[in-house]
């Protein structure tokens, strides 16, 4: 299946405790169908001290399932479904189904 969400995309949380929050995709985990989004699903973990880091309680972004996020429309920033089409150069590109705006730049 083609990747509808890629690293660097702006997404909106559509379910869960962070519903409505926008963020940038930091990491995609395709084997688990999960993504890590900046500032979303924050968890606290105890970090062991190292030579460069004092350790203690640290906040990290935990992965969320891709079904709980939607791509933000480049035109108005609302949640939108993603489609694929072949451009004039023969490349497969993503576009927002609601506005027709291209997501890939």
Curated annotation (Swiss-Prot):
Any one cellular-component term (Gene Ontology): ribosome
SMART domains the UniProt entry points to: KOW
InterPro entries cross-referenced by the UniProt entry: KOW, Rib_uL2_dom2, Ribosomal_uL24, Ribosomal_uL24_KOW, Translation_prot_SH3-like_sf
GO biological process: translation
Annotated GO MF terms: rRNA binding; structural constituent of ribosome
Listed CDD domains: KOW_RPL26
Family annotation (NCBIfam families): rplX_bact
Protein family according to the UniProt entry: Belongs to the universal ribosomal protein uL24 family.
Function per UniProt: One of two assembly initiator proteins, it binds directly to the 5'-end of the 23S rRNA, where it nucleates assembly of the 50S subunit. One of the proteins that surrounds the polypeptide exit tunnel on the outside of the subunit.
HAMAP family: Ribosomal_uL24_B
Name of the molecule in the record: Large ribosomal subunit protein uL24
Organism whose genome encodes this protein: Hyphomonas neptunium (strain ATCC 15444)
């Amino acid at each position: 299946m083609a990747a509808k969400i890629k690293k660097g995309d702006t997404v909106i949380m559509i379910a869960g405790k962070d519903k409505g929050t926008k963020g940038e995709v930091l990491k995609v985990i395709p084997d688990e169908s999960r993504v890590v989004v900046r500032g979303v699903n924050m968890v606290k973990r105890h970090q062991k001290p190292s030579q460069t880091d004092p350790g203690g309680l640290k906040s990290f972004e935990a992965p969320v399932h891709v079904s709980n996020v939607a791509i933000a429309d480049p035109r108005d920033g609302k949640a939108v479904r993603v489609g694929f089409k072949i451009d004039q150069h023969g490349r497969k590109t993503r576009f927002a189904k609601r506005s027709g705006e291209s997501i890939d730049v």
